[in-house]
Regions:
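Proline-aspartate-enriched helix->loop->beta-strand connector
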Residues: 35, 40, 63-86
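Conserved catalytic scaffold of divalent metal-dependent phosphoesterases
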Residues: 1-65, 110
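Binuclear metal-dependent phosphoesterase catalytic core
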Residues: 68-73, 85-129
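Generic alpha-helix signal with a bias toward terminal, lower-confidence helices
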Residues: 15, 52, 83, 117-118
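Hydrophobic/aromatic beta-strand patches that form the interior of the parallel beta-sheet core
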Residues: 4, 78-80, 104-106
Length: 129
């Protein structure tokens, strides 16, 4: 089994392991093709990545460059991420399978109140390989 892992995610606030989207695109270009599993901190754009912005509006906040590399070049069997914690009134946790690409996306980082006061409240995903 070939696995690629990364802690990086697009810049949002003052957190560790963040890079500008331009720098991240160059970084994602280095993901080797033929990986079975890609496990990264943040999701691809449009894949379990809905979140409330500062204006309390929903937006897709995943990385579009990462999505391009995953769907068109790397093509892993499984793509695992977290980082997007909102799941109040949103389906953001769990698994999403894209049959046209034969890729399963996973987000197991849900919290119920957007403030982490209840902690991680989603029990994760189990994937048989």
């Amino acid at each position: 089994i070939k696995i690629f892992g990364s802690p990086y995610t697009p810049t949002y606030g003052e957190w560790s392991f963040m890079k500008s989207r331009d720098k991240l695109n160059r970084y994602w270009e280095q993901i080797p093709e033929g990986m079975d599993i890609v496990a990264v901190h943040g999701p691809c754009k449009g894949m379990l990545d809905l979140s409330y912005n500062r204006q309390n509006e929903l937006e897709f906040c995943g990385d579009s460059a990462l999505r391009k590399h995953i769907l068109n070049r790397v093509k892993p069997k499984y793509f695992l991420s977290g980082h997007i914690h909102n799941f109040e009134d949103i389906i953001n946790t769990g698994l999403r399978y894209l049959p046209d690409y034969d890729i399963t996306f996973s987000n197991a980082a849900g919290v119920t109140d957007r403030k982490f006061s209840l902690g991680i409240t989603f029990n994760g995903n189990i994937i048989e390989i």
